[in-house]
């Protein structure tokens, strides 16, 4: 069975997007700073050296994506193809007509549990990459998110969009691995059930 993993770069004060996060400025002001560990200067993804490179490789071994509607709409559903894997979008409403041009994108309107089950089935023996603050929060609440990999960036944003703004209750975590690099502290947790 596949595992679901939230991979997220985050400021020390918990922000995954800076102020002014909107469609014309996805990720908000300062967003590139959160991803410099693998995309220097906000440019193309570059495999880092050492242990960060190993994490980068792991991060790209997903077999399906579960992403929130806001996330996929800001990036135009990655043009309908994110490395050839299926993209599942839990949503309370059906997609707009342009999504019909993206056969790998599936909107799931019968709940986060169904969306995750479909994503895990599509992922096979690889993991499901989870994208989006709200979607990750709902997956935690429903008990269908298995692991967190947080790339803690040494910066304080002071505002923007937080990853864990609202949680239904306390969530206990097991530390799987901690890797320190000059650009980030990479924290891998398993969710205790």
What are these regions (language model features)?
Residues 1-193:
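Enzymes that bind and transform nitrogen-containing heteroaromatic metabolites
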